Swiss-Prot record:
Compartments, as annotated in UniProt: Nucleus, Nucleolus
Gene Ontology cellular-component terms listed: nucleolus
UniProt-recorded name of the protein: Nucleolar GTP-binding protein 2
Residues given in the record as GTP binding sites: G299, Y300, P301, N302, T303, G304, K305, S306, D343, C344, P345, G346, I347
Role: GTPase that associates with pre-60S ribosomal subunits in the nucleolus and is required for their nuclear export and maturation.
Biological-process GO terms, alphabetical: ribosome biogenesis
Coiled coil: none
Single GO molecular function: GTP binding
């Protein structure tokens, strides 16, 4: 309660009082409420707050909703859903909305074969009867035909997993330099899986000059098997280095599997920026229940992942360099209030069939650290047109001889050692860098479906000169503005 002051002369004196106001009383009761009252023997006489074990009788609400099926679907509707779902399942441009509202366990066809009936494998009399034999082998099939099919499938899977050991002498092992193991370390793969786990949409960057060679099939199979709910986009970067018809054909073929876009990473003069932003906003609307989505950029080294992020932000937010391995760790970059981007280091998927030449041509290594680079010049001469090399370096007459080509170019540029010897290593590194950075026009043409003479390219196949389509002068001038 409130106490009033008493005026005695010129002084105001507050009387001494022991009364407590209501707030103080509630505070004291709160402190005492958690303790139980005990007698002299220590037994609890009165329980404290939340210590009582007495429970009131409860009963279920008499409501029909608690005792009936929550969701019911007829067989006809289920068949309709199953047919429509099977038609749209492999369409890369279709996305399933509200997956939790559908009986996915009934719609999805079981991929695994059902196990054989246990009674057919182990009869009751042979297991628990007088003739019981508990040590008999447990077979995975109920008949000889099923057993032979199971053995054949197991053999095919074994051959598929161990295909790298086919036609290889066990006593001979390939010896690679330490530099060729870059991009395959455990740390790099940990960074990749961090970015994949944190991303809702994954953009795989491909070099438009060699899309199949810079494609990570291992990551695609991992996403299909382990994380089918994540969205994948293929981005053909460096499309300014190849003709328009070639870009159109690659997009036509790759769009059958994933949404594919053409892109040219440039802060001042980009191409495909609006289409990519619009596509990411569509994915953001699909996840309207989230505050934001994350977009991860993965791919081979030197495919332009950081450059694409800088292009989308219209300023430099990630360090870039024309050499592979510039990005060491993953990093978050904000694009909009609802879209975040994740930059990831480049990875080189393991492939036992890849040779040293193929790894270098894909641009996955730093050429200055490679020993004897002149041995890879012959493959570059096969991939590039002769007239483009002549126009780039102003030399001619090497007749597809890599040694003579290096000698002519060294004397043209003046890169000679003591005694007038040719500096083959410096010339080879210069040519390989020009080849990777687009100063020498080249590209791998997509296989035409109607032309049987074309050879379908794979990840580990180098194309000879006669399989390439001649570049036009327009592409050459774009790649060499000073020529």
């Amino acid at each position: 309660m409130c106490c009033k002051a008493i005026k005695l002369g010129n002084a105001r004196v507050f009387p001494v009082t022991t009364f407590r106001d209501a707030k103080k009383v509630r505070w004291i009761n709160l402190l005492k409420s958690g303790k139980a009252k005990r007698n002299k023997s220590g037994k609890i006489i009165k329980q404290g707050e939340f210590q009582s074990k007495d429970v009131q009788d409860a009963r279920i609400q008499p409501y029909r909703r608690w005792f009936s099926n929550t969701r019911v679907i007829s067989q006809d509707v289920l068949n309709m859903f199953r047919e429509s779902f099977a038609e749209k399942l492999n369409d890369p441009c279709k996305v399933l909305l509200k997956q939790n509202k559908l009986p996915m366990s009934l719609l999805m066809e079981p991929t695994k074969t059902r196990k054989a009936n246990i009674i057919d494998i182990e009869p009751f009399d042979d297991t628990f009867g007088k003739k019981s034999x508990r040590k008999r082998a447990k077979l995975y099939a109920s008949s000889i035909e099923n057993l032979s099919n199971f053995a054949f499938e197991s053999y095919e899977n074994y051959i598929k997993k161990n295909s790298e050991y086919e036609n290889v002498d066990k006593n001979i092992q390939k010896s690679f330099e330490a530099i060729f193991s870059k991009g395959t370390s455990k740390r790099i793969w940990n960074e990749l899986y961090k970015x994949i786990d944190s991303s809702d949409v994954i953009i795989q960057l491909l070099d438009a000059r060699n899309p199949l060679g810079t494609r990570c099939k291992h990551v695609e199979e991992y996403l299909k098997k382990e994380k089918p709910h994540k969205h994948m986009i293929l981005l053909l970067n460096k499309c300014d280095l190849i003709p328009t018809w070639c870009t159109r054909e690659w997009i036509k073929q790759l769009s059958k599997e994933y949404p594919t876009l053409a892109f040219h990473a440039s802060i001042n003069n980009p191409f495909g920026k609006g289409s990519l932003i619009q596509l990411l906003r569509q994915f953001s609307k699909l996840h309207s229940n989230r505050r934001q989505i994350s977009v991860g950029f993965i791919g081979y080294p030197n495919t332009g992942k950081s450059s694409v992020i800088n292009t989308l932000r219209s300023k430099k937010v990630c360090n870039t360099a024309p050499i592979p391995g510039e990005t060491k760790v993953w990093q978050y970059v904000r694009m909009t209030s609802k879209i975040f981007m994740i930059d990831c280091p480049g990875i080189v998927p393991p492939n036992s069939n890849d040779s040293e030449t193929e790894i270098i041509i894909k641009g996955a290594l730093r050429i200055e650290k490679v020993s004897n680079p002149e041995q890879y010049i012959h493959a570059i001469l096969n991939l590039c047109e002769t007239k483009h090399l002549e126009r780039t370096y102003q030399i001619s007459g090497w007749e597809n001889d890599s040694t003579k080509f290096i000698e002519l170019l060294a004397r043209k540029t003046g890169k000679l050692l003591k005694g007038g010897e040719v500096d083959e290593s410096s010339i080879a590194k210069m040519v390989i860098n020009d080849f990777i950075r687009g100063k020498i026009p080249w590209f791998i043409a997509p296989a035409q479906e109607n032309d049987p003479s074309n050879i379908k390219l794979s990840n580990n196949t180098l194309v000879e000169k006669n399989h390439l389509t001649t570049l036009d002068d327009e592409i050459y001038n774009d790649a060499n503005p000073n020529a």
